[in-house]
Amino acid sequence: MLVINSCRAASRLALRSLNLRSPIATRTFSTGLALKTKDVVNITFVRANGDKIKTSGKVGDSLLDVVVNNNVDLDGFGACEGTLTCSTCHLIFKTSDFEKLPDKPGDEELDMLDLAYELTDTSRLGCQITLSKDMEGLEVHVPSTINDARAA
């Protein structure tokens, strides 16, 4: 019992001497997460009929994540949940935006895009596009027909 009481007393003394304003304490209690205002990108999805859906996503999320996380009403979009097996997250980019995308499509994505309706030279799968801060204000077009390549 004496040992327990002396441990408690030592703990209290250590807590009293802890300076919560010290850099070490600040780092210890910091989450390490970026501020929301710095890691959010505004995006507009344009339906084939011209209707615009404005939403936002976190830097590092895919365009598929943005649709799912914000409950964007795009019927059938992302049926395979980003496993590169369906082409339902087919999106069409403006040429200027397409050229700025950091990664070029891989063979698997190109194979899926071959099965997509309304394919263009600036088509990509939303599950393969990762948001970055320089995509702020991005506007992407959703084809009028969504094709699930798994049904082919």
From Swiss-Prot:
Locations listed in the record: Mitochondrion
GO cellular component assignments: mitochondrial matrix; mitochondrion
Major location category of this protein: mitochondrion
The record's free-text note on cofactor binding: Binds 1 [2Fe-2S] cluster.
Binding site for [2Fe-2S] cluster: C80, C86, C89, C127
Similarity section: Belongs to the adrenodoxin/putidaredoxin family.
Disruption phenotype: RNAi-mediated knockdown results in larval growth defects, strong larval lethality and strong reduction of ecdysteroid peak level required to proceed to pupal stage. RNAi-mediated knockdown in the prothoracic gland results in larval growth defects and lethality at the third larval stage, with a complete lack of pupariation.
Gene3D superfamilies xrefs: 3.10.20.30
GO molecular function, one term: electron transfer activity
Organism taxonomic ancestry: Eukaryota, Metazoa, Ecdysozoa, Arthropoda, Hexapoda
Keyword Nucleotidyltransferase: no
GO BP field: electron transport chain; P450-containing electron transport chain; positive regulation of ecdysteroid biosynthetic process; steroid biosynthetic process
Protein name: Adrenodoxin-like protein 2, mitochondrial
Keywords of this entry: 2Fe-2S, Electron transport, Iron, Iron-sulfur, Lipid metabolism, Metal-binding, Mitochondrion, Steroid metabolism, Steroidogenesis, Transit peptide, Transport
PANTHER family in the cross-refs: ADRENODOXIN-LIKE PROTEIN 2, MITOCHONDRIAL, FERREDOXIN/ADRENODOXIN
Organism: Drosophila melanogaster
Domain 2Fe-2S ferredoxin-type: residue ranges: 41-146
Residue ranges that the Swiss-Prot or TrEMBL entry lists as coiled coil: none
Cofactor(s) listed in the protein's UniProt record: [2Fe-2S] cluster
Known role: Required for ecdysteroidogenesis in the prothoracic gland which is necessary for larval to pupal transition.
Keyword match Cell division: no
A matching Pfam family: Fer2
Transit pept. (range): 1-29
